[in-house]
Amino acid sequence: MRIIGLDVGSKTVGVAVSDPLGFTAQGLEIIPINEAKGEFGFDRLADLVKDYKVEKFVVGLPKNMNNTSGPRVEASQAYGKKIKELFDLPVEYQDERLTTVQAERMLVEQADVSRGKRKKVIDKLAAQLILQNYLDRMF
């Protein structure tokens, strides 16, 4: 069963997909969105759902360190609700605290990636971490 993991931001959505057995997550791409214009990348997401035969979504929930809802929690939940309606697939939420920080650290310390290049992959890597954390919790 393939699962798509999403890191929903205000300008981009990082996308990751699980392997067919649901053990590992791989970063796929970053979908540009524009909340102000109501552009949320659902057409591209539909292509990915079809191509990978996805059966579930996992959306990162950006909670605060004290476990309260952060400013983006509502937006992430609204995105999750919309994809549930559009694709009629289950949507689960995964705490994403510090995934972007973890992704940034990995890119700097382990891969020595420049700031400009980090911006191009950070959301995809964060989505991968969100999905991998979910998969690890499930197995």
Swiss-Prot record:
The keyword Hydrolase applies. GO terms for biological process: rRNA 5'-end processing. One of its GO terms (cellular component) is cytosol. GO terms for molecular function: nuclease activity. It comes from the Bacteria. InterPro entries: RNaseH-like_sf, YqgF, YqgF/RNaseH-like_dom, YqgF/RNaseH-like_dom_sf. SUPFAM superfamilies: Ribonuclease H-like (SSF53098). Keywords: Cytoplasm, Hydrolase, Nuclease, Ribosome biogenesis. Its EC number is 3.1.-.-. This is Putative pre-16S rRNA nuclease. It comes from Streptococcus mutans serotype c (strain ATCC 700610 / UA159). The lineage of its organism: Bacteria, Bacillati, Bacillota, Bacilli, Lactobacillales.
